[in-house]
């Protein structure tokens, strides 16, 4: 049996974070959660996730800046990143893609099963 894929969930809404963490755990992932951009950066290096689910609007350091730093840090430059945010403007999606996001999902337009499906897709896991 292969080791569990590691997911770092970066979300400042505790209720949403708890729901996503529970579902991802049930799906068989090893999940770590943090609630702000500063903690995301240190946890990404320490935890060595296979994929990061990253909110955009967070305290301390926003998700776009976190993404930029991740892409310019040798230990995290190749980690898959899915931005999961309330920001729905095309310019926000373009900014995320330009900074190196692998995917961009708008919270109001997806349900948790959609997010799990995208995670599996980016990790090359069959349903």
Q: Which sequence ranges carry the predicted segments?
A:
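Helix N-cap/capping motif at the beta->alpha junctions
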Residues: 33-42, 63
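Active-site beta3 strand of CheY-like receiver
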Residues: 47-53
């Amino acid at each position: 049996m292969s080791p569990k894929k590691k997911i770092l969930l970066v979300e400042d809404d505790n209720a949403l974070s708890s729901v996503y963490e529970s579902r991802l755990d049930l799906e068989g992932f090893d999940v770590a959660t943090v609630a702000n951009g500063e903690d995301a950066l240190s946890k990404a290096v320490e935890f060595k996730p296979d994929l990061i689910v990253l909110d955009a609007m967070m305290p301390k350091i926003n998700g776009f800046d976190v993404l930029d730093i991740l892409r310019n840090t040798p230990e995290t430059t190749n980690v898959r990143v899915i931005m999961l945010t309330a920001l729905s403007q095309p310019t926000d999606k373009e900014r995320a893609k330009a900074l190196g996001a692998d995917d961009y999902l708008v919270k109001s337009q997806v349900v948790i099963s959609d997010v799990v499906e995208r995670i599996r897709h980016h990790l090359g896991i069959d349903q």
